[in-house]
Curated annotation (Swiss-Prot):
SUPFAM superfamilies in alphabetical order: Glyceraldehyde-3-phosphate dehydrogenase-like, C-terminal domain, NAD(P)-binding Rossmann-fold domains
A Pfam family the protein falls into: Gp_dh_C
Family assignment from sequence similarity: Belongs to the glyceraldehyde-3-phosphate dehydrogenase family.
Name of the molecule in the record: Glyceraldehyde-3-phosphate dehydrogenase, cytosolic
GO BP field: glucose metabolic process; glycolytic process
UniProt-listed Gene3D superfamilies: Dihydrodipicolinate Reductase, domain 2, NAD(P)-binding Rossmann-like Domain
Chain residues that bind D-glyceraldehyde 3-phosphate: S148, C149, T150, T179, T208, G209, R231
PANTHER family given in the database record: GLYCERALDEHYDE 3-PHOSPHATE DEHYDROGENASE, GLYCERALDEHYDE-3-PHOSPHATE DEHYDROGENASE-RELATED
Reaction equations catalysed: D-glyceraldehyde 3-phosphate + phosphate + NAD(+) = (2R)-3-phospho-glyceroyl phosphate + NADH + H(+)
SMART domains from the UniProt entry: Gp_dh_N (SM00846)
Lineage start: Eukaryota, Discoba, Euglenozoa, Kinetoplastea, Metakinetoplastina
């Protein structure tokens, strides 16, 4: 049993918590957020995207009690004050989006935790790990990142294709669901003017660091991929469009067969495969981080192909945070 603390009970913090309820080998023992316990219970119990929490949620004497288990609740701004050791926390899920460097995340270590997993790309050279891509290279680093949800979708797919046929170069577009950083109506956004436009009214071109991050977790593709994002007015589930030029010739049918073999083999539980007539909402709640859509892709010729893969940018990512915790705890 790995004891886990969560710092930041927003979208990812709460979905990680929900996912952890399905894991008998993970126990959430502490949550830190500036929300009070009553509101924390409310936001866990009711979710507009994922529905009602499947279980009991109460607040008793300031603690969050979920399915009869008491969870310590704190509201500390400085992670150094969290005293994780008092409740036996081994790993902290850093999901505030604020402590994304070695220096700032180390405050959790100072507070008694053994390790930290960031739920987003780091702001420094903190090592990133993606399950199915480079998780086996973990060497005991106390502070790591689970990269981004888009990187977790793109990297497994790109790795399979590159190892089978070789990728000369590629462009990626993620058609990405709305996230909490966006505006409900037009509002100030000085660093990204288009990002300040109303999320429900627009398709918004944006940047993404996912292709560059793939080069870090899978160096064979370093410098070979770049990409962009379109933010679209849907609440959840995103899709990657990966267009690549191949070294070795391959028919689209051959590529699909290679991806299917990986999904049923070494990438099982990470990469999925579907030939159904699916749309985005069909992937809401799917724990896989990348589901290849056979019928959505196309090829121009045996060297130039477009591949499409879906991901629940909340659920799939959160499950891989937990998978990474278990993998790094088993060392």
């Amino acid at each position: 049993m790995v004891k886990v603390g969560i710092n930041g009970f927003g979208r990812i913090g709460r979905v990680v918590f929900r996912a952890a309820q399905m894991r008998p080998d993970i126990e959430i023992v502490g949550i830190n957020d500036l929300l009070d316990a009553e509101y924390m219970a409310y936001s866990l119990k009711y979710d507009s995207t994922h529905g009602r929490f499947d279980g009991t949620v109460e607040v008793i004497k300031g603690a969050l009690v979920v399915n009869g288990k008491s969870i310590r609740v704190t509201s500390e701004r400085d992670p150094a004050n969290l005293k994780w050791d008092e409740i036996g926390v081994e790993v902290v899920v850093e999901s505030t989006g604020l402590f994304l460097t070695q220096e700032t995340a180390h405050k959790h270590i100072e507070a008694g935790a053994r390790r930290v997993v960031m739920t987003g790309p780091p702001k420094d050279d903190t090592p990133m790990f993606v399950m199915g891509v480079n998780h086996t290279t973990y060497k005991g680093q106390p502070i790591i990142s689970n990269a981004s949800c888009t990187t977790n979708c793109l990297a497994p797919l790109a790795k399979v294709v590159n190892e089978k046929y070789g990728i000369v170069e590629g462009l990626m577009t993620t058609v990405h669901a709305t996230t909490a950083t966006q505006k409900t109506v037009d509002g100030p956004s000085l660093k990204d003017w288009r990002g300040g436009r109303g999320a429900s009214q627009n398709i918004i071109p944006s940047s993404t660091g996912a292709p560059k991050a793939v080069g870090k977790v899978y160096p064979a593709l370093d410098g070979k991929l770049t990409g962009m994002a379109f933010r679209v007015p849907t609440p959840n589930v995103s899709v990657v469009d990966l267009t690549v030029r191949l070294e070795k010739p391959a028919t689209y049918k051959d590529i699909c067969a290679a991806i299917k073999a990986a999904a049923e083999g070494e990438m099982k539980g990470i990469l999925g495969y579907t030939d159904d007539e699916v749309v985005s909402s069909d992937f809401n709640g799917v724990a896989l981080t990348s589901v290849f859509d056979v019928k959505a892709g196309i090829s121009l010729n045996d060297h130039f192909v477009k591949l499409v893969s879906w991901y629940d940018n909340e659920t799939g990512y959160s499950h891989k945070v937990l998978d990474l915790i278990l993998h790094t705890s088993a060392r």
